[in-house]
């Protein structure tokens, strides 16, 4: 299998796409996400119903706008949240992962390695930068080609930088947007909200400010 396809070719495009990612709290503080395109249409969602202890879960599920399961992200034990694996669709017993993610164990090195299993064009990616600061880049390990970026989002109408619960995921041409969002979910599980600042403005994205 070649190209940037890993999850679903519906989310691969010939031009760069900028998605708006919003962390949500449906009932409790947790790991819910909604993801919108530049027109304000829902693209992905992640729902958390586990109550106040949702961060203790070992699995996170990425769905499309219609609730179809695209990816299941599962913590690999024992790993203290440093190692995660991705499964296509809804994970079943005995199913093999399609990729693995591991955080560097070297003190002071802020990088994450993504290993893709199987016959794909690129078998390894690096995620560099600070997810907590919403400033990191996904690159092909061998070529250093950028395939996705996570950045702080600025409100187009006011030119004000939004809080870190709303940020941009920029997906390069030919790269699987569902795979990119799956990596965002893993980063959120690995790093959590440790670097998030308190008291920043929270704004729900709409078509006007996407």
Curated annotation (Swiss-Prot):
It comes from the Eukaryota. It holds the Pfam family LOR. InterPro entries: LOR, LOR_sf, Tubby-like_C. Belongs to the LOR family. Might be related to the phospholipid scramblase and tubby-like superfamily of membrane tethered transcription factors. This is Protein LURP-one-related 5. It comes from Arabidopsis thaliana.
């Amino acid at each position: 299998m070649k190209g940037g396809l890993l999850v679903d070719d519906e989310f691969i495009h010939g031009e760069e796409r900028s998605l708006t990612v919003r962390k949500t709290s449906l009932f409790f503080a947790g790991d819910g996400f909604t993801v919108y395109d530049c027109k304000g249409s829902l693209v992905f969602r992640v729902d958390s119903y586990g109550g106040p202890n949702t961060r203790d879960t070992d699995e996170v599920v990425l769905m499309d706008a219609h609730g179809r399961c695209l990816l299941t992200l599962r913590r690999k034990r024992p790993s203290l949240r440093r190692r995660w694996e991705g499964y296509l669709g809804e994970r079943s017993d005995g199913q093999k992962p399609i990729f693995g993610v591991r955080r560097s164990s070297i003190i002071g090195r802020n990088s994450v390695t993504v290993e893709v299993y199987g016959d794909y064009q690129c078998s390894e990616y690096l995620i560099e930068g600070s997810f907590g600061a919403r400033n990191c880049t996904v690159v092909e390990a061998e070529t250093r080609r950028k395939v996705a970026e996570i950045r702080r989002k600025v409100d187009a109408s006011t030119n004000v930088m939004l809080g870190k619960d709303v940020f941009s995921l920029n997906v390069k041409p030919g790269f699987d947007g569902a795979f990119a969002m799956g990596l965002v979910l893993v980063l959120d599980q690995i790093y959590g909200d440790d670097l998030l600042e308190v008291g920043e403005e929270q704004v729900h994205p709409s078509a006007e400010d996407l």
